[in-house]
């Protein structure tokens, strides 16, 4: 039953959620880890009745050999799987509700400390619409470890906050799923539901998450300028290093 359900889950990810085959298979492999764990310990619980304690024990055992980012993806896959089960009326409860992803940690540029990034975020003027956008943008840029090109290309249809991940098109047009912390989600949601909603969005730019005041997709140059200005506002004179596009150019 588990493997048949896992196959159906992967079809759901592709057809209903629009994820690539590689991404769906990747999530399926995470579920396969759970299946192997259940087989190893002769646990007979099914997708419909597996309990939270069993899932918690599985995550604890497997997570010991994974870094924080891989742990977060595993938990994201499990959450997606059991939300799929609820979607298919396979169960009424959500056994992953109390199992949280680990802190992934901020991917820092070479020249900035965590304290400096926190100071930058705290310094942003939230009395303006751009301030709310910039805080959400910088929070996502660093907390999710995105390249600038990935940030400006991010679309509303790439946000899967119910499953705690975003879909990113990386180098070579390869799709990947990036876990996103609840705090970062909150910042982005506030921007989308408030400041972004007030914009007159230009035709063809409706799906981009981060927009300029004319309702158009931001450019890389704009991102660099915004981050540099925020850094300078707290007295940071050092060069700000951001992860750039696939070409590695700045």
Segments (PLM) and residue ranges:
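Conserved catalytic core of the tyrosine transesterase superfamily
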Residues: 1-250
């Amino acid at each position: 039953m588990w493997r048949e359900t896992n196959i159906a889950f992967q079809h759901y990810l592709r057809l209903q959620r629009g994820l690539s085959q590689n991404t769906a298979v990747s999530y399926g492999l995470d579920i396969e880890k759970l299946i192997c764990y259940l087989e190893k310990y002769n646990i007979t619980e099914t997708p419909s009745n597996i309990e939270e304690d069993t899932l918690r024990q599985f995550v604890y055992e497997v997570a010991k050999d994974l870094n924080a980012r891989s742990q977060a993806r595993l938990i994201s896959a499990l959450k997606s799987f059991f939300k799929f089960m609820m979607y298919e009326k396979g169960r009424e409860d959500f056994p992953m509700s109390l199992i949280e992803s680990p802190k992934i940690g901020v991917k820092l540029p070479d020249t900035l400390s965590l304290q400096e990034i926190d100071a930058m975020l705290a310094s942003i003027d939230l009395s303006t619409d751009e301030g709310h956008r910039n805080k959400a943008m910088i929070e996502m840029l660093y907390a999710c470890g995105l390249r600038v090109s990935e940030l400006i290309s991010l679309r509303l249809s790439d946000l899967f906050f119910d499953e705690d991940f975003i879909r990113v098109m990386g180098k070579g047009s390869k799709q990947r799923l990036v876990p996103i912390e609840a705090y970062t989600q909150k910042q982005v949601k506030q921007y989308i539901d408030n400041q972004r909603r007030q914009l007159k969005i230009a035709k063809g730019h409706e799906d981009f998450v981060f927009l300029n005041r004319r309702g158009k997709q931001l450019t890389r140059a704009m991102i660099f300028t915004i981050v540099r200005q925020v850094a300078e506002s707290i007295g940071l004179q050092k060069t700000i290093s951001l992860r750039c596009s696939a070409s590695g150019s700045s």
